[in-house]
Amino acid sequence: TLGEPDEKGRRKPVPLDEVETDESVAALVTTGTDKFYSNGLDLDWMGSLPESERAASGQMITDTIRLLGRLLGFPMFTVAAINGHAFAGGAMLTLAHDVRVMRTDRGFWCLPEVDLGMPFAPGMAAIVQARLTPQVAHEAVITGRRFAADEALAKAIVDAVAPETEVVRDAIALAVTQAARGRSSVGQLKRDFYDPALAIMAEGALPS
């Protein structure tokens, strides 16, 4: 998992260094707990910061964008086991994975920034555009639609759906099918394929 979530499903990701440097790890599966996969950044905390500390808020956004970019180009097969709600940065986190498996009986996938009055940072727009079709990206971003599992599957936002008890199992099974691929070739292919998006995400620029 990417760290323990709080009661609202917000989580602080652990560094990917540990995974990447462990040669025994051949694939990566992420998941959440209970009804949340991830709700992304802690907007309440960010909004509560005094003016003198607002730089920390901007740095958190930059760090998140760069994390998404690192995961998008990660040198092994990655699968998101979406066990519950995936909103905002949490939804973008799922897009950084190679494959997504979503729980059928609970949870929505959503980019709610339009309802929050929040602009997309260039790197956030880049990952959405890189991983979704133009039509689906437009619908998700401009309408803020909440996609249930079957709807997300029909739109190719996710690659598979499964009941709660089988989400992680199916995600691991998918990871196993690709685990034999060499890290160097997988990483290079991802970097080549997503180079334009990765370049934007590496900058970590804030919304204009």
Q: Where in this protein do the model-derived segments appear?
A:
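Conserved CoA-thioester-binding segment of acyl-CoA-metabolizing enzymes
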Residues: 1-31
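Catalytic-core regions built around general acid/base machinery
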Residues: 15, 63-75
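Hydrophobic/aromatic residues within transmembrane alpha-helices
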Residues: 30, 42, 93-94, 152, ...
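A short acidic, glycine-rich active-site loop
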Residues: 48-62
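CoA-thioester-processing core
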Residues: 67, 71, 81, 87-140, ...
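Acidic, divalent-metal-coordinating active-site segment for phosphoryl/phosphodiester hydrolysis
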Residues: 88, 144-151
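Well-ordered beta-strand positions
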Residues: 99, 139, 143-145, 160, ...
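C-terminal long alpha-helix characteristic of the crotonase
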Residues: 102-103, 107, 153-204
